[in-house]
Curated annotation (Swiss-Prot):
Keyword rRNA processing: no
Name of protein: Myoglobin
EC class of the enzyme, as a word: oxidoreductase
Annotated positions binding heme b: H94
Gene (UniProt): MB
Residues annotated to bind nitrite: H65
PANTHER family per record: MYOGLOBIN
Organism: Tachyglossus aculeatus aculeatus (Southeast Australian short-beaked echidna)
Length: 154
């Protein structure tokens, strides 16, 4: 289920736009995740006290963590599927420490696509959305494989 060179170009073109304000995009992604799937908020001790969108928008910690999440994802996307070295420590921490299910990775993938569509509609048409969907599915599938190696069925 690899991506073609053209698909990777579409993914990385829009990702370049994300990187111009990675913390802002990350904050928007996490807020979207928490609003559409409130159960995911329980996995974040640091944020579970945030009940409203205004509280989330005002949280410097949430904005910072959003940047961390998207920076890690960006380093994986830039490897165009050759991301073993970047993926292994991320999978290990998410499997053994944070216990983040693959379902939650699906939810954040949906949030990422929604935020990119709303912020960059001119650069994120149907082809780019499909390519990003494939890239995020590749990421999730590889995370699931690593989870099993760490004994987490996630």
């Amino acid at each position: 289920m690899g991506l073609s060179d053209g698909e990777w170009q579409l993914v990385l073109k829009v990702w370049g736009k994300v990187e111009t304000d990675i913390t802002g995009h990350g904050q928007d992604v996490l807020i979207r995740l928490f609003k559409t799937h409130p159960e995911t908020l329980e996995k974040f001790d640091k944020f579970k006290h945030l009940k409203t969108e205004d509280e989330m928008k005002a949280s410097a910690d949430l904005k910072k963590h959003g940047g961390v999440v998207l920076t890690a994802l960006g380093s994986i996307l830039k490897k165009k599927g050759q991301h073993e070295a970047e993926l292994k420590p991320l999978a290990q921490s998410h499997a053994t420490k944070h216990k983040i299910s693959i379902k939650f990775l699906e939810f954040i993938s949906e949030a990422i696509i929604h935020v990119l569509q709303s912020k960059h509609s001119a650069d994120f048409g149907a082809d780019a959305q499909a390519a990003m969907g494939k890239a995020l599915e590749l990421f999730r599938n590889d995370m699931a494989t690593k989870y099993k190696e760490f004994g987490f069925q996630g």
